[in-house]
């Protein structure tokens, strides 16, 4: 939500949601559609584009993200790593961008993100590889990479982000936070 508001300050935004078959996606996708229909976004957000990039053929069927059994509340970020997630998402969305003459992809990793596919070196390398492979310039920006979550929340407050329409949960109950996973813990902190 904050990323969309931030990017929309000076350009139209084409939001993209990529389904991978993960347990939380149905609730997340429904709330994303509601969020993007909120008055704050209406003047600069294009309709949500849905893409598919299933991972059930590469992650084991017992993987917590597929089954909806996330690690517990006290789990550190490093325990919820989804191998290759950003590589897959960026590859998929970059093809969409090339076909639609979009050059900018915004991602929202925060300071302290421990994952190898969320580093400046990774984003720079994959942007170069995708630009070469697609014969289309791809610029991957990460405007919050030096910010902590609380800084992003404060920024979102200045934009008037409707937090009640956001979801940060790995095992939502209908459209509500489960209150038991590490993403719910982060949200409360």
How would you describe each model-predicted region?
Residues 1-160:
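ATP-dependent adenylation/nucleotidyltransferase module used to activate substrates
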